[in-house]
Amino acid sequence: MNLFDKKHLVTQADALPGRNTPMPIATLHAVNEHSMTNVPAGMEIAYFAMGCFWGVERLFWQLPGVYSTAAGYAGGYTPNPTYREVCSGQTGHAEAVRIVYDPAVIRYEQLLQTFWENHDPTQGMQQGNDHGTQYRSAIYPLTPEQNAAAHASRERFQSAMAAAGDHRPITTEIAHATPFYYAEDEHQQYLHKNPYGYCGIGGIGVCLPPDA
């Protein structure tokens, strides 16, 4: 694979080797002071990739029922990659967000609605002006129920796009969750720490129809 080819996913054989040591991050979420790693009893986890993770993380931490969020890397091969390595296209990872949520307050389907309505899922290996495999649109389900909901929502959103006159095919990857690696601490809750920082996400003006 061309080292500078960022429109095609690297193979596992060609991916960077990575490291055994996770990135050190703060113990508590900078916005709500909840644990960055623990999952309280009764709560569930969701993983989404929809472009630059700075804006994506903020989008989800603002939702009622979301306990914590974290920026990281998912869907690739390299263990515990650095931001620079992910941006090289040589890890296979997407910039992703880990969401710990209370299903008694917010359903997975509501998280999917936020996902579909707040980015462009047709752009392949980019999102807006951000180009590279790390910016691809992806859902990484953890359970058969999440997987079924993700696929059903993609079909509904594709139909809603067609009804709105947008016939571009959705390129969102839906694949069973592989290990999630936390990004460096400077990327965690980035837009809380840097309120005027870059946020490159935006929807296409189509709403996800409700599930039956």
UniProtKB/Swiss-Prot annotation:
**Which Pfam families did the record assign?**
PMSR
Record key words, sorted? Oxidoreductase
* Gene3D superfamilies in the cross-refs: Peptide methionine sulphoxide reductase MsrA
Q: What sections of the sequence does the record tag as coiled-coil?
A: none
Is the Oxidoreductase keyword given for this protein?
yes
Reactions it catalyzes? L-methionyl-[protein] + [thioredoxin]-disulfide + H2O = L-methionyl-(S)-S-oxide-[protein] + [thioredoxin]-dithiol; [thioredoxin]-disulfide + L-methionine + H2O = L-methionine (S)-S-oxide + [thioredoxin]-dithiol
Instruction: Tell me the SUPFAM superfamilies matching this sequence.
Output: Peptide methionine sulfoxide reductase
Provide a GO biological process annotation: cellular response to oxidative stress
Q: Which GO terms describe its cellular component?
A: cytoplasm
Q: What molecular functions are annotated in GO for this chain?
A: L-methionine-(S)-S-oxide reductase activity; peptide-methionine (S)-S-oxide reductase activity
Q: Which domain of life is it from?
A: Bacteria
Q: What is its EC number?
A: 1.8.4.11
* EC category name: oxidoreductase
Q: Could you name the active-site residues?
A: 52
Name the InterPro entries for this protein: Met_Sox_Rdtase_MsrA_dom, Met_Sox_Rdtase_MsrA_sf, MsrA_MetSO_reductase
Similarity annotation: Belongs to the MsrA Met sulfoxide reductase family.
* Function summary: Has an important function as a repair enzyme for proteins that have been inactivated by oxidation. Catalyzes the reversible oxidation-reduction of methionine sulfoxide in proteins to methionine.
Family matches, as NCBIfam families:
msrA (TIGR00401)
Supply the name of the protein: Peptide methionine sulfoxide reductase MsrA
The organism encoding this protein is Salmonella choleraesuis (strain SC-B67)
